[in-house]
Amino acid sequence: MAAPEGSGLGEDARLDQETAQWLHWDKNSLTLEAVKRLIAEGNEEELRKCFGARMEFGTAGLRAAMGPGISRMNDLTIIQTTQGFCRYLEKQFSDLKQKGIVISFDARAHPSSGGSSRRFARLAATTFISQGIPVYLFSDITPTPFVPFTVSRLKLCAGIMITASHNPKQDNGYKVYWDNGAQIISPHDKGISQAIEENLEPWPQAWDDSLIDSSPLLHNPSASINNDYFEDLKKYCFHRSVNRETKVKFVHTSVHGVGHSFVQSAFKAFDLVPPEAVPEQKDPDPEFPTVKYPNPEEGKGVLTLSFALADKTKARIVLANDPDADRLAVAEKQDSGEWRVFSGNELGALLGWWLFTSWKEKNQDRSALKDTYMLSSTVSSKILRAIALKEGFHFEETLTGFKWMGNRAKQLIDQGKTVLFAFEEAIGYMCCPFVLDKDGVSAAVISAELASFLATKNLSLSQQLKAIYVEYGYHITKASYFICHDQDTIKKLFENLRSYDGKNNYPKACGKFEISAIRDLTTGYDDNQPDKKAVLPTSKSSQMITFTFANGGVATMRTSGTEPKIKYYAELCAPPGNSDPEQLKKELNELVSAIEEHFFQPQKYNLQPKAD
């Protein structure tokens, strides 16, 4: 356990204490020997990387590289984390021993440290079962959304998913869901973090995962949950007869992750011919050998093999899941022969329009609209707001991340409301509220049905997107980031924005663009509110300022919770009838250039631009 601040221990003494404790506790021969080797070599630099600071447990759980030490994902840190989580749950739920928890995992592995998602999941299960708590442990890999689905379906106290989603291959993660089926939000992260610090010494049975196989407390939910998930999914199939007859062909890639068999099953549930799978990428492979980054959000580079297969099989649509299948990218072949990869905001517009249109056909009574909702995050396109204003349902924005949308959706559902859809620009979609998180499996098959239906009207996805913008107003978006590894520099950049025109004066313009409103969710300031106080929750630990411009533009600058990035998201919203998207794009590009030049000031702060 790290020496507490003010304990009088210097940096070297603290490092010595951490490594000594590690040698005493670690029973994984690979990580134990790695630390012994570093000590023998006197490799202080590497030891500091491994032991400098314990991984911080946040609302997204843990995410870090696999390897030895307290700053990495490994057997010992998984045991310590789970012991803390277990003790925290015992305090929160008096019926934990009756209800239990669910654990699943993706296909990640790190042979040099002996770490893998499956191994970590079994160690986590061992921790809970040793305390008399039932564990529903999937016997094989699943998509991340199967964990929140299982929590809700079986009415469990919590869920754990071992995954690093679309991160580089060396990483892994530990994602946590609460009994409401949504990701945890504060203050649970702080409570769990404190409980981890109080339970660092491994419990007697912590390392012996063979004990769980004969335990009556171990349950395998795979078959029943698989069946229940696809039965629930069928309720979102609106055009079964169209699906049976469609001539539209699809290609699917799971990018070496878990999605392949689940998307095949989803297509069968909708009576669609299953998509052609990219053979080099369909099976799980923790090395992700065919891609630089296993992230379909990176666009065409990840989709090269998909496009080649689609060209060969004459498929018009490519569907791409990230490795844990909670996100989805869609690309469509244009008449020119070029491939168009839809942005997260564009697919959000298409899916939102589709789910509302399909719901409206089944609900002719307009009075139901007053209890109908869609959600998106504050940095995502406001296209759903435009559709809601015209059609009469409710739109709400939340803070960034599905933890906020999932928790808000659950509140609304508990109040008897209907939540049709939620999305975020980072290609995350909740099309079916039986999963209170983003779900790339349901999004893939619903996108396929949408494309099949449009084909009966001789429309492509691109043509329908244009029709949505013509009817509800063009929403042109642009997002990017700068890399900055120095937290003090990031803080200074944002503080300077808060005192741009003298102390405590935010900027009144950005270049030639006049600013009409400012919301600062770090300080809680919002000059659009009568009392100047922001309505959305605020957080002093992360930077986030939104500027609204007189020309209808909105831009948000924020820090990333998981990467050394300052991100920006800009959007220009035009009223219906403005059908000159090229002019809007030009104006948005000018606005973004002004923001980069005047607000980011990359030369002054030594920021690295996003690599092309």
Swiss-Prot record:
Q: Which cofactor does it need?
A: Mg(2+)
**Where on the chain is N-acetylalanine found, per UniProt?**
2
What Pfam families would the database entry show? Answer: PGM_PMM_I (PF02878), PGM_PMM_II (PF02879), PGM_PMM_III (PF02880)
Record text on cofactor binding: Binds 1 Mg(2+) ion per subunit.
Q: Where in the cell?
A: Cytoplasm, Cytosol
Task: Give one GO molecular function term.
Answer: magnesium ion binding
Keywords per UniProt: Acetylation, Carbohydrate metabolism, Cytoplasm, Glucose metabolism, Isomerase, Magnesium, Metal-binding, Phosphoprotein
Residues bearing Phosphoserine are 165
Q: Which SUPFAM superfamilies match?
A: Phosphoglucomutase, C-terminal domain, Phosphoglucomutase, first 3 domains
State the GO CC annotations: cytosol; nucleus
How it assembles, according to the record, is: Monomer.
Q: What is the name listed in the Swiss-Prot or TrEMBL entry for this protein?
A: Phosphopentomutase
